[in-house]
Design a protein with these regions (language model features):
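Structured extramembrane domains adjacent to transmembrane segments
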Residues: 73-199
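Feature marks short, highly hydrophobic, charge-poor N-terminal signal-anchor/signal peptide-like helices
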Residues: 1-12
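Short glycine-rich, low-complexity/disordered patches
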Residues: 48-59, 175-182, 218-220
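Conserved structured core elements
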Residues: 12-16, 33-36
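Hydrophobic, Leu/Ile/Phe/Ala-enriched alpha-helical segments that form helix-helix packing faces
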Residues: 38, 42-50, 166-169, 209-217
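N-terminal topogenic membrane-targeting module
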Residues: 25-99
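Long, compositionally biased interface segments
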Residues: 185-220
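Terminal, regulation- and interaction-focused segments at domain boundaries
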Residues: 17-27
Length: 220
């Protein structure tokens, strides 16, 4: 009986080891393909004059910093974090904690952003992000593509411009947080990226920066 138990245990360990190895190679390949695709697609749209990449370790993503210095776009930065598809054990946990791949855009225009505005998808953050002077901002709930967003703003027209931007993207519900922050002069977008639509969405972010951030109410 003991010999049978040991044999069964060995078989289970062997199967898990084999599955882990297979998952590692398949998941690593997919994540590398995704990273390469996002990098090429975004770079093709932004066309930086200088670029810098920082590997985040393993196969979970990278950070990119682009110097653009064209039109209203001074710098275009983003951080891509992918689910650990190469890890059989950690991947299910990440699906519960991280939930999906993420891309964080930090866009720095030449024009000065004058007022604070945020759209935050309700229920997305487990811990609410710290927003400076939040108590002085107007607050309301709006709906975009069937999802509720908490809107925080100084002037309603700022929020309306952000709402129109989100609605114009390929899959608006993928946008989790979009904001304009005067203190850092940053236009920020957190979203779930999609390989099929990333190029079109980045084009719209660049167009918004070049056209809308130059106009009232943001820069005057």
């Amino acid at each position: 009986m003991r010999t049978m138990d040991n044999a069964t245990l060995f078989a289970i360990i062997f199967v898990i080891a084999g599955a882990s190895t297979l998952q590692f190679y398949k998941g690593r390949k997919l994540n590398l393909q995704l990273m390469q695709h996002y990098l090429r697609s975004i770079e093709e749209v932004v066309k930086p004059e200088d670029k810098d990449y920082v590997w985040l370790g393993g196969y979970i993503g990278f950070r990119a910093v682009y110097k653009v210095n064209r039109d209203n776009l001074r710098k275009f930065e983003y951080t891509l974090t992918l689910l650990p598809r190469h890890s059989l054990l950690y991947f299910p946990i990440a699906l519960l904690t991280s939930r999906h791949d993420k891309i964080y855009f930090v866009i720095r225009p030449f024009a000065e952003i004058k007022r604070e505005a945020h759209l935050i998808q309700k229920g997305y953050y487990r811990l609410k992000p710290n927003i400076e002077n939040e108590e002085f901002l107007q607050r309301e709930t709006i709906e975009i593509a069937g999802r509720e967003y908490e809107a925080l703003y100084e002037k309603k027209r700022d929020m309306v411009k952000l709402k129109k931007l989100v609605e114009s993207l390929s899959k608006p519900h993928n946008v989790k947080h979009v904001s304009l922050t005067p203190k850092t002069n940053v236009f920020y977008v957190l979203m779930k990226p999609e390989p099929e639509t990333i190029e079109k969405d980045v084009e719209k972010l660049v167009r918004f920066t070049n056209e809308k951030l130059r106009e009232s109410p943001f820069s005057s």
